[in-house]
Regions:
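A conserved beta-strand-loop-helix scaffold within acyl/acetyltransferase catalytic domains
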Residues: 2-160
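Ampipathic, surface-exposed secondary-structure segments
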Residues: 142-143, 147, 168-174
Length: 174
């Protein structure tokens, strides 16, 4: 990696074989927390809500209601209908969210273009939040046959409950 001038290299969710290979080759394994949601045969979002106590259900419904009352809707784009413009829009949201926290985004437009043009096998899905016919936020996920991996998100505005709706609830409904 030094020959390539690479400072760090991160692999998210390696399968068991790759994880073992990395350990055997002295890569450092990082342990952290992650949220994994499992669909336990829920037919819809309401079924999912029924696992919670009444107060928790009410809180989630109130969060979703806030977004709905702001007239924010959602558009789901996958590899079949993602365009270069969609990737450009997502990058603007992603970059803005980092810059608001005085940080530099660690992924650049080249990465997103590469995913779009060369890595259809990752099966990207972007959940776009729409307000007044304009995209205002997005959450990027990758999918396998039975798993939706979410990690990247961004928004133009700091709107209460928008992060959870875009990153979690939309993915659960999907």
């Amino acid at each position: 990696m030094q020959d390539e001038n690479i400072e760090t290299w991160h692999i998210l969710f390696p399968d068991n074989e790759l994880a073992e290979f990395l350990r055997e080759n002295n890569f450092v394994e990082r342990y952290g927390y992650k949220f994994i949601w499992r669909n336990k045969s829920y037919d819809n979002f309401e079924d999912y809500l029924n696992i919670f106590k009444s107060r928790q259900r009410k809180n989630i419904k109130n969060e979703r209601k806030k977004i709905s009352e702001l007239d924010i809707s959602f558009e789901i784009k996958d590899m079949k209908n993602l365009t270069n413009k969609d990737w450009d829009d997502f990058y603007i949201f992603y970059k803005n969210t980092y810059e608001e926290r005085l940080q530099r985004p660690y992924l650049n437009t080249k990465f997103f273009k590469y995913v779009h043009e060369c890595r259809a096998d990752l099966r990207p899905v972007i959940f776009f939040a729409i307000h007044k016919n304009k995209k205002i936020a997005g959450s990027l996920c990758f999918q396998s046959n039975d798993t939706l991996y979410g990690r990247h998100w961004g928004s133009l505005y700091n709107i209460d409950s928008l992060h959870f709706e875009t990153c979690y609830y939309q993915g659960i409904e999907y």
